[in-house]
Regions:
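ER/Golgi luminal nucleotide-sugar-dependent glycosyltransferases, focusing on the catalytic module
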Residues: 1-133
């Protein structure tokens, strides 16, 4: 059975998202994941879309993907929807209750969610493009 494994997103931080506590060393994780799939399936193709441009060589060397895209996260800025597009035009009214930290956290979470799903869709898109070529 042939298997396609799609990796996407940004390398996580040691103490949370967005590189908090410094970025993780993903070498061991990549090797374990690759070994798991390669040992279980005879024919595995890897595809990668990642915001971790600085990890491009490492990821490509370990996974040897059929296709990969590494790009800065800022490429999606013009595609992001605003809070108002999701009916959250009154988010400022929550400041009195939760303070500015809530709004800042919400904006970061909102950007993260859109980035995640964009990257997920790009990894599937490059897999599809490869399979159609």
């Amino acid at each position: 059975m042939k298997l396609a494994v799609c990796f996407y997103g940004n390398v996580g931080g040691k103490k949370g998202s967005h590189g908090h506590g410094g970025y993780q060393d993903i070498t061991e994780h990549l090797i374990k994941n690759k070994n798991h799939f390669d040992n279980k399936y005879k024919d595995v193709d890897y595809f990668v879309h990642s915001w971790s441009v600085d990890k491009k060589d490492l990821i490509n060397n370990v996974l040897n993907p059929k296709s990969s895209i590494f790009e800065e996260n800022s490429v999606i800025n013009d595609q992001l929807k605003s809070l108002e597009d999701y009916g959250l035009r009154n988010i400022n009214s929550y400041e009195n209750m939760f303070g500015n930290e809530f709004k800042d956290f919400f904006k970061i979470s909102f950007f993260s969610a859109q980035s995640r799903w964009y990257s997920n869709s790009k990894s599937l898109e490059i897999m599809k493009n490869y399979s159609n070529s």
